C-alpha cells in the first residue's frame, strides 16, 4: 500500500485536500488489506500503516483552516471523554460506506464497513464542536442513553454534519 496522504487516497473515497490527512485506528492492533499494524499516539498518523490511537490526539496535530482531514479507520472506536473539536476548518470522517466495499476491505458476510464511535462515559456527548467550519461525516455515533452524539456551540458556525447515523436508545436514526 502506498503512503498517499494528499489529494485523496488509495481508496479514492477520502476527501481531496490541500491539507494533511491523519489516520486514527479503532484499536491498538488493527488490520488493513490483510496486514497487521499497531496504532499509537507516538506515530505521526500520516499513513494508515502509522495510525494514531485517539481522535483527540489527531485533532491536536491539525492546523486551523488548512484543510486537514482526520480519517477514522473502519471499526469500533471507543472514547472515555467528550472529544473537543477545537480546531477550525477540519474534517473528521469515517470511510464512506454508502456503496459495497471491494472484497479487500469488506467485512465477512457481505456487510458494509462502518466506522462507529461509542462513548464509555456515564453521561455526556461524543463530539463538542466549538469552532467554525468543521465537517463530520460517515460515522455511526452511539452515545449513552443520557448523552448525545454531537453538540455544536454558538461559535460552531457553518458546521457540516452529513452521512452520519446515530443510535438513540435501541433505535438507529439517520442525518443526511
Where do the language-model regions lie?
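Membrane-topology and secretion signals of cell-surface/extracellular proteins
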Residues: 12, 26, 53, 67, ...
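Solenoidal tandem-repeat scaffolds enriched in leucines and small polar residues
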Residues: 166-176
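Detector for repetitive beta-architecture
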Residues: 21, 67-69, 76, 82-84, ...
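Short, T/G/N/S-enriched strand-turn elements that build extracellular solenoid repeat scaffolds
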Residues: 55-64, 77-87, 102-105, 123-129, ...
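Right-handed parallel beta-helix/beta-spiral solenoid domain characteristic of secreted/periplasmic
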Residues: 88-148, 169-171
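Glycine-rich repeat segments that build the extracellular carbohydrate-interaction surface of secreted
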Residues: 22-27, 53-78, 91-97
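Extended, low-complexity segments enriched in Ser/Thr/Gly and acidic residues that occur primarily
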Residues: 1-20, 63, 107-116, 140, ...
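Right-handed parallel beta-helix/beta-solenoid
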Residues: 1-57, 76
Amino acid at each position: 500500500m502506498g503512503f498517499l496522504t494528499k489529494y485523496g487516497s488509495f481508496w479514492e473515497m477520502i476527501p481531496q485536500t490541500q491539507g494533511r490527512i491523519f489516520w486514527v485506528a479503532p484499536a491498538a492492533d488493527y488490520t488493513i488489506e490483510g496486514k497487521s499494524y499497531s496504532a499509537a499516539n507516538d506515530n505521526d498518523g500520516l499513513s494508515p500503516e502509522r495510525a494514531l490511537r485517539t481522535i483527540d490526539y489527531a485533532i491536536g496535530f491539525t492546523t486551523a483552516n488548512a484543510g486537514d482531514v482526520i480519517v477514522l479507520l473502519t471499526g469500533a472506536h471507543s472514547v472515555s471523554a467528550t472529544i473537543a473539536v477545537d480546531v477550525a476548518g477540519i474534517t473528521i470522517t469515517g470511510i464512506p460506506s454508502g456503496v459495497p466495499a471491494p472484497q479487500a476491505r469488506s467485512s465477512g458476510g457481505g456487510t458494509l464497513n462502518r466506522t462507529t464511535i461509542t462513548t464509555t462515559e456515564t453521561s455526556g456527548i461524543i463530539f463538542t464542536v466549538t469552532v467554525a467550519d468543521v465537517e463530520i461525516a460517515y460515522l455511526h455515533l452511539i452515545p449513552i442513553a443520557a448523552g448525545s452524539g454531537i453538540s455544536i456551540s454558538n461559535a460552531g458556525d457553518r458546521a457540516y454534519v452529513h452521512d452520519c447515523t446515530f443510535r438513540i436508545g435501541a433505535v438507529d436514526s439517520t442525518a443526511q
